[in-house]
């Protein structure tokens, strides 16, 4: 599971060989959420404050998230994304 960024203590990653639609995962304090890159719809249990943070960050970095999704799906090298909001 390649780590793309760590945003205010929230680990952002995409799993190898993951299912469609394109999405990423965020992990914080034992909680894990999957977020659709296109719709930004979250699935999973995640603290509300951290969910707001990661959704705001993802909106700013949507193109980079999708680019990384495509790279990882093609088994190519991904790149890190800035944690800046």
Predicted regions, residues:
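C-terminal structural segments of small proteins and small subunits
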Residues: 53-85
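Short, charged low-complexity linear motifs
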Residues: 8-11, 43-47, 51-55
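Generic structural signal for residues positioned in beta-strands
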Residues: 11-13, 34, 80
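A short, structured beta-strand/loop element
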Residues: 15-48
């Amino acid at each position: 599971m390649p780590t793309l960024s760590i945003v205010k203590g929230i680990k952002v990653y995409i799993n190898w060989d993951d299912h469609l639609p394109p999405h990423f995962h965020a992990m914080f304090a034992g909680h894990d959420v999957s977020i659709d890159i296109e719709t930004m719809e979250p699935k999973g249990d995640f603290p509300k404050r951290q969910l707001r943070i990661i959704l705001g960050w993802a909106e700013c970095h949507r193109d980079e998230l999708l680019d990384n999704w495509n790279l990882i799906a093609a088994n190519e090298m991904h790149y890190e994304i800035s944690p800046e909001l």
